[in-house]
Structure formats: C-alpha cells, structure tokens
UniProtKB/Swiss-Prot annotation:
Molecular function GO labels: guanidinoacetate N-methyltransferase activity
Subunit structure: Monomer.
Gene designation per UniProt: gamt-b
GO biological process, one term: creatine biosynthetic process
Alphabetical list of SUPFAM superfamilies matching this protein: S-adenosyl-L-methionine-dependent methyltransferases
TM region(s), chain numbering: none
The protein's name in its UniProt record: Guanidinoacetate N-methyltransferase B
Example of a GO cellular component annotation carried by this entry: nucleus
Annotated S-adenosyl-L-methionine binding sites: W17, M47, F66, G67, M68, A69, I70, A71, E87, C88, N89, W114, E115, D132
InterPro entries: GuanidinoAc_N-MeTrfase, RMT2/GAMT_Mtase, RMT2_dom, SAM-dependent_MTases_sf
C-alpha cells in the first residue's frame, strides 16, 4: 500500500465528481475517478459479504454507490423484491442503466449525490440498506458514512430492517496508522456513532474475513475485512 495519502489537506472532489470520467480499466478490475482509487475487483468476496447481509431480510433493498456492480450483482442473486440504487457519477450511472436491463428483480436507478436523493425517500421504506460510497473530500474522508447513518439510515429502515456499510478508504488508513485490531477499530470508531444514530449496541454485530489485498492497492493493505450487521428494532 502506498504511503501517499488519498486526500490532500482541504481537498474536495464533490463539485466535479458527477461528470468526471469513470475510469474502468481494460480488464474491468479497477475503477478510478479523478485519480482516486474507487474500487478494485479483489474486493469481490467482501462486497458479496456486504450484499448478503443487506439482502438477508428480503423485500426492498437500497444500495448507495454502484461502482463496479460487484455488490449489486450479488444482491440480484438473492431473494429480494426490489433493488433501489443511488449513483452520482455520469459514467457509472450509464453502466448502471445498462446493467439494470439484464437483472431479474425490479431495479430503481436514482441519479445524484446521496445527499440530494436520500431526503426524498420515504420513512420505513427499506428492508435492507448497503452504503458504500466513495468519500468526496478530505473533510469527510472518515465521517461521510455517519452523515448518512445519523441523518437517514434509521428512518429509512422498516422495523427489523438491516443496515450494512463500509468505508474502506477510511478504514484502510486507520488500520495503517492507528490500529492493528480490526474489531477494536470498529468498536472504537464506528459503534459509538451507530448508537448515536439510534441503533442499540446489542443489535450491532460484525464478522471478520481474511482477504489479502494486492500489494499495489493504494487504499487498503490490512489482511482482514469487517462486515457489520446493524438491525433496527
């Protein structure tokens, strides 16, 4: 993993992200936007783990961030009814629209930043949520998921619904600079924020998988990954 930081101090990509080129490489194993490493194919087992949790209650699932369709494709293999997907980048959204025509379940593609789209969605509408967007500024690098979770995740879920999420760009940095125990990292940096959002500690659980990133991965080098399961009761 490169020692170069993903974001420079004060850097923000938010205003230019939507129409920046979606750089899928020739082998479709990497996605870069504005030079940022958004997603890589080696994440597949982990993305499938997140998708399995998000689909575990069936029904209507909200996915925030489409990327390379790794989690989305897994969700479509699960026993769900509807699949709502928010994506703000033009090129990625075009790929989402093409992908949607080939899927077995009802797909509802929603174009825009989640900050603009999510407030329009009704309360108690989803059985599952998978949040995996890319941070768009240095200021929100480690915290953007909490803006969604505290502002919207709890209200969007039906009672008994499930939330899962990740912020690999943040967690990769934390596991490189501050933590060598991934469960401790989650308990100290994530769980208190989830409780603040209305979820109860006893309804927050995690599973850990072994997964070795390639040496040239710029955002994650830790050899374990963590999948949260957060239930609204």
């Amino acid at each position: 993993m490169s020692s170069e930081k993903i974001f420079l101090e004060g850097e923000s990509c938010q205003s230019s992200w939507h129409n920046a080129t979606a750089g899928y490489d020739e082998t479709d194993t990497h996605l870069e936007i504005l030079g940022k490493p958004v997603m890589e194919r080696w994440e597949t087992p982990y993305m499938h783990s997140l998708a399995t949790v998000a689909a575990s209650k069936g029904g209507r699932v909200l996915e925030i961030g489409f990327g390379m369709a790794i989690a989305a494709t897994k969700l479509e293999q699960c026993n769900i009814e509807e699949h709502w997907i928010i994506e703000c980048n033009d090129g990625v959204f075009k790929r989402l629209q093409e992908w949607a025509t080939k899927q077995p379940h009802k797909i509802v593609p929603l174009k825009g930043l989640w900050e603009d789209v999510v407030p329009t969605l009704p309360n108690g509408h989803f059985d599952g949520i998978l949040y995996d967007t890319y941070p768009l500024s240095e200021e929100t690098w480690h915290t953007h998921q909490f803006n969604f979770i505290k502002g919207h995740a709890y209200r969007l879920l039906k009672p008994g619904g499930v939330l899962t999420y990740c912020n690999l760009t943040s967690w990769g940095e934390l596991l490189k600079t501050k933590y060598n125990d991934i469960e401790k990292m989650f308990q100290e940096t994530q769980t208190p924020q989830l409780v603040d959002a209305g979820f109860k500690c006893e309804n927050i659980s995690t599973t850990v998988m072994n997964l070795v990133p390639p040496e040239d991965c710029r955002y994650y080098s830790f050899k374990k990954m963590i999948t949260p399961t957060i239930i609204k009761v």
